[in-house]
Amino acid sequence: MMEGLKKRTRKAFGIRKKEKDTDSTGSPDRDGIKKSNGAPNGFYAEIDWERYNSPELDEEGYSIRPEEPGSTKGKHFYSSSESEEEEESHKKFNIKIKPLQSKDILKNAATVDELKASIGNIALSPSPVRKSPRRSPGAIKWNLSSEEVARPRRSTPTPELISKKPPDDTTALAPLFGPPLESAFDEQKTEVLLDQPEIWGSGQPINPSMESPKLTRPFPTGTPPPLPPKNVPATPPRTGSPLTIGPGNDQSATEVKIEKLPSINDLDSIFGPVLSPKSVAVNAEEKWVHFSDTSPEHVTPELTPREKVVSPPATPDNPADSPAPGPLGPPGPTGPPGPPGPPRNVPSPLNLEEVQKKVAEQTFIKDDYLETISSPKDFGLGQRATPPPPPPPTYRTVVSSPGPGSGPGTGTTSGASSPARPATPLLPCSSTTPPPPPPRPPSRPKLPPGKPGVGDVSRPFSPPIHSSSPPPIAPLARAESTSSISSTNSLSAATTPTVENEQPSLVWFDRGKFYLTFEGSSRGPSPLTMGAQDTLPVAAAFTETVNAYFKGADPSKCIVKITGEMVLSFPAGITRHFANNPSPAALTFRVINFSRLEHVLPNPQLLCCDNTQNDANTKEFWVNMPNLMTHLKKVSEQKPQATYYNVDMLKYQVSAQGIQSTPLNLAVNWRCEPSSTDLRIDYKYNTDAMTTAVALNNVQFLVPIDGGVTKLQAVLPPAVRNAEQQRILWKIPDISQKSENGGVGSLLARFQLSEGPSKPSPLVVQFTSEGSTLSGCDIELVGAGYRFSLIKKRFAAGKYLADN
């Protein structure tokens, strides 16, 4: 391109005049270069319009030569070998520009800025160009072909030639974001009837009113249930609908098979004994709460003979507390952390039993329980008559601070202290940096009066304290005395009680924080310091048990039964609150994914429901508050040291889909020979069985081996063999999607026998899981007056067997 350039004489960049009528615009800021209108650089005086003529333009806006239209095609914009003087003598143009008409002048007033903008439309020379900051670069058309760049343009303003980028069409991006969020509960199924036969196995009822299996018993049996809260317009008027509840005769198809397995009777030391028909019938007597002398919480200090039989010897600190679900009643699995209580079959996640005198039973408090799941709405003002006192320290703070509550003098606003405590200085809630609590002396478990117990600004789970947002209350803080909670201005005086064991026994989760409570104190139940208009904390727990029987490797022969229960937990101080507020708001809740349940047995003395609801996916229940208050009062009298009261609300059976509903698929293969036995166990983690994929914890595989085992030739992975009990045990900490091969594995073993061949025995598997359920059910409150401080979900293996 540069080879054709001649030595510059009076033209800039060697541009020929026949290719460009006007002077070069490549370097407009250089001195000595003329403007296209003949004026020197920087001169913007009156323009001589007679020098211009309106040329004829083609369809692209280019000027057409008068003598040789289109003669520029095929030409080049660089100089040829001929001199410019010779070419100029051959090619001379006389150009006249017509003056603009008046109407055109009105439309396009030739201002200096518009002239500068119009110059930008002229095609640039390929020569290196330095742009001037006074020249607008935005009007240059960049998407021109090489031919278009070579063709010259006139400097006449032509606004229609300016390239304009069309705006982006935002509607075209809509498919990138996908369809709108669909409802999580689209699947509509037929509403499950409540009047189903009882699914917990047949047995002799202890209630005389339940002797007839077809007896129709309306509930509640006590005071007529109150109407739902008036401040819930969406809730229709309810009527106490009768519910047919009675023990049924339905039995599982594997009852005969499972109970005919004599080789499992010697597994008591690990998983507890197999429930015989007699024990199942005895356990079936454990029905709903009823206001008799025996508390449903089972506070007897000693185990009855029945409890001694059912209690698993290997897990005394993890009792179960739900009735046996028929012939597949689960032995007590390794339950969640909680103090021991009377054993049932499914451990309750919020066990309220008293703490025994073992330190090992209280080692469950770990950092993995410190999860903040509070909702921002919990920190709102709500319907508070008076701002509540500051919260107690959190889990990490309590361990090294004087106690799980604020000091005796800690308060929010001016008000009289509790009658049982002297008045002490108050700590304004607007203070952002209160003094930290003093360290806890090892020989002084109580906080001296007058010293604040809150103020650790680095607490990990405490919300910011502002004057416009009252701090949350301490629902389960131990008080220094058993003062009444009727005063709305009473100050929190929670301190650490004198206990024999320094290890905390219970953890209460409320408003995004964990509070430690203590058993064994002589100060009575923990008061619930709050006003009459404050919301009461309630905890809910779903506990489900999966019972499965696998036959060989055939999925069609898998039998599954899933049972569950929903428990509500109330703080002990709620009894005093009810005593001072005899007409509390009705507790109403809604169970979500109700259509996945086959049989539902509400507590007939405490729960009412509306069977006329249209939505089969949800079910609304409300509590008979007079019966609940009577029940909690009786429990508090029988268990004055209890911190929480668990009340069974629902028992249900989950709709199972065969092997697809089992969280862990199993297949066992035996090869028995006179001198040796080969055993292979295949397992597979099944995420489809859970609503949320969670790990299976503490997985144990137990197999009895007979035939006189003399040697273990190969065991993969390593296992523990008990020669006396003739069994082999594999322990896997957890199985999940993150495990090797996505939770798919095998267990292999070969045994040398002296009294062979061996007889194949059923495989027994145990596991627990936290954070999800197999039914996918959830719960939410309806109306005001209460709040959920914790919703816990878990499931465990009951009778989880696999045979050859």
Swiss-Prot record:
One Pfam short name: muHD
Keywords: Coated pit, Endocytosis, Membrane, Phosphoprotein
Subcellular location(s) per record: Membrane, Clathrin-coated pit
Location of the region described as Necessary and sufficient to mediate interaction with CANX in the Swiss-Prot/TrEMBL record: 625-804
InterPro entries the record matches: AP2_Mu_C_sf, MHD, Muniscin_C, SGIP1_MHD
Regions of compositional bias (Pro residues) in chain numbering: 221-236, 322-346, 433-451
Biased composition, class Basic and acidic residues, residue ranges: 16-34, 289-309, 354-369
Region (Disordered): 1-90, 124-181, 199-254, 289-500
Compositionally biased residues, Low complexity: 413-432, 458-468, 475-498
Membrane topology of this protein: Peripheral membrane protein
GO cellular component: AP-2 adaptor complex; clathrin-coated vesicle; cytoplasm; plasma membrane; presynapse
Function statement: May function in clathrin-mediated endocytosis. Has both a membrane binding/tubulating activity and the ability to recruit proteins essential to the formation of functional clathrin-coated pits. Has a preference for membranes enriched in phosphatidylserine and phosphoinositides and is required for the endocytosis of the transferrin receptor. May also bind tubulin. May play a role in the regulation of energy homeostasis.
Protein's name in the database: SH3-containing GRB2-like protein 3-interacting protein 1
